[in-house]
Structure formats: C-alpha cells, structure tokens
C-alpha cells in the first residue's frame, strides 16, 4: 500500500511546464536519428530513380506518363492538405488554443511521417539490396499513418505537452504499422479509406490515452474549454478542406481504374447525404431549432469515415447515400448525448469529440465493409470483378465473398484491440511526471507553450466594427458578451 501511495504522490506532484530542454532535445535527437536511419535503410524506388530510363526500356514503357507519380500525385496533394490544413484548422475551435491546434498538428505530422516511412517500409517487401524503396504511394501511406495520430490528438487537445505528443506519435506510428500489416497483409482485409486501420485505431488509441490521463479537476479550466465566434469560423475552414478532399483520401491508394473511380463516387455521395441529416438532427434536438456549430464542423464528415472500408466495393450510389444518412444521425446524437455520458460515467474527456466523428463511424465502416464483402456476387461484380476485389495479394487465390466478410470482421477486432490496448499502455507512459504537461487550471491555453500576442479578444474585429451600424444598439452588449469575451 505504501508503494501505491508513493507512486500516486509522484504522479500528483506540482506540474513543471518548462520544456526548454526536453523539447529541443527530443526534436534534435529524433531528427539526427532519422538522418542516420534514412541514410542506412532508405532509397528511391525504381520510378523515382535515375535508372527509370532503363526500367522503361526493360518493361517496354513508351512514356513517362506511365510513371506512378502522375497517377498518384493529385491524390497525394489533396491528402497532404487534409493532414496539415484540414486536421489542423478543424481543431482551432478552442478560444485560446489555436496556436497549439495548428502548430502542434504541424509538428507531430512532420515528426510522424518520417518514422512512418521507416516503419511501413520495414513491414513491406524490401528491394534486392535490402533497402526500403520509397515512391509517391509510400508518401500517401505515411500521411495515412500520421492521420491516425492526429485523430488521437483530438482526444487530448489542450491537455498535454508537445513532448507528450511526440512520444504519443512515436508509439502510435509503431502500433499503426504493426496493425496495418496484420489487417492488410496477414488477414488480407480490404480497407481503402481506412475506416478500420486509420479511424477506428486512431480514435480508440486517443480515447484510451485520454482515459488513463483523466483529470478530475479539469473544470478549473472549463472557461477556456469552449469557442468564440471567430475560432469556430477558423475550425469551419478545416471542415471544408476535409469535406472537399475526402474523396481523394478514400480513393488515393485504390487500384487505377474502376476501383479508384468508384471509391471517389461513393465517398462524394456519402458526404453529401451526411450534411443534410446532420443539419436536421442538430436543429431537431435544439429547443429553439438553432444549429450547433460543433455538429456542423464535425458530424458532416462522418459519412466519409464510414464509407472508407467499402469505398471500392459495389456499394451502389444509393447505398452510399444510406451510409451517409445514418452516420449523420448517429454522429450528431453522439455529440448531444454520448460525449457527456463518456465524461461523466466512463471518465473519458474527449476534447474534440473524436468518438463521434472517427470511432463510431469507423466501426460502422468496418461493419458495412464486412456486410458488403459477404454479400458480393458474380451477378453484381462479374468473375473478373470478384477476382480483382477479393484476390489475395501475391497469389492467384480468390476468397469466397462470405469468407472475405469474416476476415473483414476480424480486421475490425484487430483495430479495436490495438487502439484500446496500445492507448492504455501509452497512456501509462505519458502519465509519468516528466513530460511537462500543464496543470488543470492551465489546460486549453496557448500561453503555457507559446509566445502569445497581447490579448485582443475585447477588440471587435475591423469588419464587424465597420458594419456595427447595422446592429441595433441593444444588441452591442450581447454581441460582445457572447462572441468576444471569455465565458466564466
């Protein structure tokens, strides 16, 4: 008992948020390590190497257009924007944590993609010289890997230090690479848009970490855990970037041709359907019928998450609309009822509500994928279609649809186990009092880790100041209180 109380005392001692030594040390050591590891293990693949000229001759390729770069780069651009702009700005809704949202998103993405290229490379076939060969598709997969860690970041937004985020990313990338290898190469499950591999794993990884790092006195900073008018507008920019580019995300690594084309169409339709049901439920469950910006920023994206696994399947346009329809309802109701329940009953403090945007839709996506695979038939897919979709990579074996459906369900279980188990372990590591995390009363505040300009929240932005003659006098005070002053 004495040891238990002693350990608890260590974890509960006063916080030291000075990261002047720890953050530079981690960044420098990590980057130097990456330079060494890339020098030893990583080389360009044949399509990025100067020997591409000879490769073309050997394979009777007549044009550089056949280089995979020209097929994949447009999708890579879109995915890259989603990672750095979409995810970053989506998390700027907190009134005093925009620097941390965008800046730390930038940091852990740049930190993680390098480690992802190595980890995913080690779990893929190596070149004849024993080196990891990287090309444009590897860059896309590295961005996918980083996306899982950015999803996890949403659960602990404003409550952890940048050093903790880097450690969380290091472990998250490693777990992701193993989980991805098991799901895609051992089980040979299909998950084009990553409903299971990316969203389910990333969300439950972050939620498990948040549960272990539970802060019983977080209400000391509740006045900072909210938005103001302009922070919600910035977050909506992130939503729109994600919404527009999600078809590229779900189709980026599909096979060229009909599969990639179908994945973009299915995602496009699911996203559109989700918007309408999100707006409907948000208005329906608000007493005055007004819309909640939290729902519009987040739940409108749930359809893109849920259609990911089945994106390249013959889901049919109406099927995509159905998936989006139900995901908009489930995700919005999750924000209204489930998020408070998770915090009050299960002690999971989910800052961004990733359980509603990524976890539940990710699980739904896994289930939709399993059902769609099991229901596949020759009448719908044709003989060659079934072979292209369900053939085991590297062999001529094609599974029966019902068997493939079982493997899809098993893959969902793997993602859940890695997310929950890995997140619990990493949460215990992050609970050690050496990472410089903020005290309860200083959460959700950029001033802990950033040089912040003088407070300007009381100043009305120039556009509104210019137009304030259009606002009745009795509305001025209300506008200042609701939109530009911190709520106590």
Swiss-Prot record:
Glycans are attached at residue 60. The keyword RNA-binding does not apply. One of its GO terms (biological process) is ammonium transmembrane transport. The keyword Transmembrane applies. Residues 43-73, 120-139, 184-191, 254-264, 320, 378-409 are extracellular. It is a multi-pass membrane protein. Keywords: Ammonia transport, Cell membrane, Glycoprotein, Membrane, Transmembrane, Transmembrane helix, Transport. It is found in: Apical cell membrane. Its main location: membrane. Homotrimer. Functions as an ammonia transporter. May play a role in the elimination of ammonia in the gill. Belongs to the ammonium transporter (TC 2.A.49) family. Rh subfamily. This is Ammonium transporter Rh type C-like 2. It comes from Danio rerio (Zebrafish).
